[in-house]
Amino acid sequence: MHHIQHPHPTHSGVDMTEGNITGHLIRFALPLLAGNIFQQLYNMVDTWVVGNFVSNEAFSAVGTVGPIVNMLIGCFLGFSSGVGVVISQYYGARRTERVHDAVHTALVLTVILCAVFTALGVGFTPLMLRLMNTPAEVFPESSAYLTIYFGGISGLLIYNMGSGILRAVGDSRRPFYFLVVSAVLNTALDLLFVLRFGMGVEGVAWATVIAQAVSALLVIVVLLRTQQAVRLIPRDLRIHLPVLRQIIRVGVPSALQMAITAFSNVFVQSYINSFGADCMGGWTAYTKIDQLMLLPMQSLALSATTFVGQNLGRGNEPRARQGVRRALAIAMAATVLVMIPVLAFAPQMTAFFNRKPEVVAYGALLLRCISPFYVLCCFNQVYAAALRGAGNSKATMIIMLCSFVLFRQVYLFIMSHYISHELIPLVMGYPAGWLVCSAATLIYYRRTSFLSTRLVAEDGSKEDIQ
């Protein structure tokens, strides 16, 4: 087993417990941001290929399955963030043997979850589509797409867990390289399967599955070859119960929060579906651009999680909090920079996905009404990520469920039944939810101590922080 000889950056991991805070946050966030942009771009290529070369029904089908896919991926990402928090705290505390145990426990769990997700996804596809009021003309293609996607979802899960492990020790660069390879391959296969072989929506699904499998393979090869504490040694693959308990403590609330928040979007989608196919098309385009606008703050939030995790591992709460303040300031500045061109060029951005005038009108309207409120999102994203890094994901789960699920559903119900069944009053449920969530998260963050939820100290082992 390889021990970390010194606390300074190795050839790939980065120790965030010393050195320039802003520099660490930005250096860590940039590959994340670039990687996420690539991921969104290749999702957009999928949508663009379908919208321009297959059919309008197929375009709506890919949009319709979005919330279902996001719900399951969100669930797994929440769980893998739990793994990342455990590893980053032990890495910060220089507890190499615990890092090793966490890596191998996480990978065994991932294999088990791959089997569960594949079975559930393939088995429940028709039921999920029916629950979402999927129109009959879109149903066969939506069903075909989801069945292939879930059949090959293991690649996505393994890649996400492997890259989460690397990020926990400060290496956000290599996961980015693998994403680029995956995105380029996905685009090439899209064009080959759809344009050359005429495979339609199924071709798009196969392209995604193959590209994700390649990124999973690359991340496993790196874990097998790395000289760091996160090295994968196949004979050591087993579940270590003390570490498993900690992963569950952080990961399960995060997974529930992400899955249920995404599930609440399924309800929003069914309200949108009631406005007809043009509005569905506009909403599909809006959600694609929305995901790009959220990326700067999400990348900085992930930086904050790793930064807080490593610094609390060392027992340095003031430095951890200083990092959170910097991350929030950078996230807000970046969000404003992204917002300006979106407000200016909303119709052109919508038309990139679908040139039908009615669809463009809906998409541009949605973008211009909702995007000025994204700055509110920075607060809940960064503070919740910081609390998660401290091992406290239960509180953020409760706050987000109350804001994004309870509050938003009550808002949608009252608005649609008693006030106005028009599009804009309904979709203002998004900014209203962000406002409630940000206020509650900020109040909680100010009143809570990071060290009380730290994982390293509770671990019961004598060999604690130096």
How would you name each of these model-derived features?
Residues R27-D46, I148, Y159, S182, ...:
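Transmembrane helical elements of multi-pass membrane transporters/channels
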Residues V54-P67, S143-L146, A205, A277-L292, ...:
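Small-residue hotspots at the loop-to-helix junctions and early N-terminal turns
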Residues F59-A119, L156-P175, Q269, G282-A346, ...:
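Small-residue-rich hydrophobic transmembrane alpha-helices
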Residues M16-F53, P67-G82, V86, V111-T118, ...:
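N-terminal transmembrane alpha-helices
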Residues I37, L41-S60, L129-A136, L192-M199, ...:
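Helix-terminus/linker motif at the lipid-water interface of multi-pass membrane proteins
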Residues M71-G74, T118, N186-L191, A216-I220, ...:
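Hydrophobic transmembrane alpha-helices of multi-pass small-molecule transporters
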Residues M1-A29, I87-S154, R196-V252, V308-F373, ...:
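Short alpha-helical transmembrane segments in multi-pass integral membrane proteins
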Residues S80, I148-R167, P175-A183, V204-V219, ...:
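Short runs within selected transmembrane alpha-helices of multi-pass transporters and secretion channels
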